[in-house]
């Protein structure tokens, strides 16, 4: 969605550190704090593996003896929307393929032998999070809750906000009472209004997942290595950075959908500080701004009371390359912002501050906000 040619985790967050750098340093800090051999293992795709491993090479202490630093997702062909045949894209054949969503983690852990290796090494539980969520730090309090809960599977949940209206939500299935996770792409058009109703569906998934290794191994073995998660049909361009390239379908599954598979699965409400996802350049702008500070423990601490609502014009800011061109001196100050909406083509100088509710609107030529400008609703 951001036109990335490499792994999103390689994007710079601040002080020259990428998502990967911060995650690696978080884990190294926790190992020292708890004197525990906490493994860090990445699920990479065929597209992200080489770049990820190159970026991690500087952290020589990161690997744990007997365990890999990565395992690979499967890959599948992208299908043309017009006839459902595999797409051909000679200018970059790699773009003919895609990973089948993060729900592939379960069969990938089995196929790679990782699940067995973790069990043989004496590990009992696994915590999984998205690499673009720097709030998902391994937390001893949540780990303790999960260990004593007896649940085979759990997801951290947060109260939904305006930013989560288009995201998935939890519900309870009437047929058997089990918790299910419904994603936007799985919701029919006539039910979209109900999906966005935050009084009806109050909680969103963080994609911070906990599971018991024994329960996962037994369930996968009973199901012949496949959990049977609901399929998600995503329509995209074969080249994410070229909106004129052919439309394709990518069939995916969601990692959190596994909650419906396990009897006794649970959700646990956590603070918003454990959910700092970067799905769009709107999110990236907030993360790079002074709304957050990077602590000595390498945790991104929110220093403003509330997160501002940011909406950048997709015609000019959707892709990271174009986004960076328009913020050449870094993100503006958003600590005192309530909302920040940008329509049109604007470039921002150094030291710009946004205060209150600000909306920029330009239907003409590109414009520039000079350095040191204070944008306010006053």
Identify the meaning behind each predicted range.
Residues 1:
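Catalytic nucleophile-elbow at a beta strand-turn-alpha helix junction centered on a G-D-S/GDSL motif
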Residues 4-256:
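Domain-scale recognition of functional cores that engage charged ligands
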């Amino acid at each position: 969605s951001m036109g990335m040619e490499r792994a999103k985790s390689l994007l710079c967050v601040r002080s020259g550190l990428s998502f990967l750098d911060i995650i690696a340093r978080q884990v190294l800090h926790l190992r020292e704090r708890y004197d525990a051999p906490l493994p860090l293992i990445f699920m990479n795709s065929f597209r992200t593996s080489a770049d990820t491993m190159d970026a991690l090479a500087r952290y020589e202490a990161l690997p744990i003896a007997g365990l890999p630093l990565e395992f690979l997702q499967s890959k599948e062909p992208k299908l043309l929307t017009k006839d459902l045949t595999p797409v051909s894209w000679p200018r970059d054949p790699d773009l003919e393929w895609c990973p089948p969503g993060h729900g592939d983690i379960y069969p990938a852990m089995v196929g790679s032998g990782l699940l067995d290796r973790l069990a043989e090494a004496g590990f009992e539980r696994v915590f999984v999070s998205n690499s673009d969520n720097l709030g998902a730090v391994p937390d001893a309090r949540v780990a303790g809750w999960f260990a004593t809960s007896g649940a085979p599977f759990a997801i951290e949940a947060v109260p939904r906000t305006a930013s989560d209206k288009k995201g998935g939500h939890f519900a309870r299935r009437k047929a058997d009472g089990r918790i299910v996770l419904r994603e936007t792409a799985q919701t029919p058009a006539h039910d979209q209004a109900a999906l966005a109703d935050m009084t009806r569906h109050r909680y969103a998934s963080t994609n911070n997942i906990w599971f018991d290794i024994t329960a996962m191994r037994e369930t996968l073995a009973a199901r012949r290595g496949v959990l049977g998660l609901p399929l998600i049909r995503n329509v995209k361009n074969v080249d994410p950075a070229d909106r004129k390239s052919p439309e394709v379908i990518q069939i995916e599954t969601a990692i959190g959908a596994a909650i419906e598979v396990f009897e006794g699965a649970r959700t646990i409400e956590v603070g918003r500080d454990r959910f700092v996802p970067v799905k769009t350049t709107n999110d990236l702008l907030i993360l790079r701004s002074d709304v957050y500070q990077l602590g000595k423990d390498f945790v991104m601490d929110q220093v403003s009371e509330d997160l501002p609502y940011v909406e950048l014009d997709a015609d000019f800011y959707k892709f990271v390359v174009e986004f960076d061109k328009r913020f050449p001196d870094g993100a503006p100050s958003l600590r005192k912002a309530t909302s920040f909406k940008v329509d049109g083509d604007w470039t921002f100088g150094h030291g710009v501050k946004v205060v209150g509710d600000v909306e920029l609107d330009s239907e003409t030529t590109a414009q520039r906000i000079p350095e040191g400008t204070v944008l306010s609703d006053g």
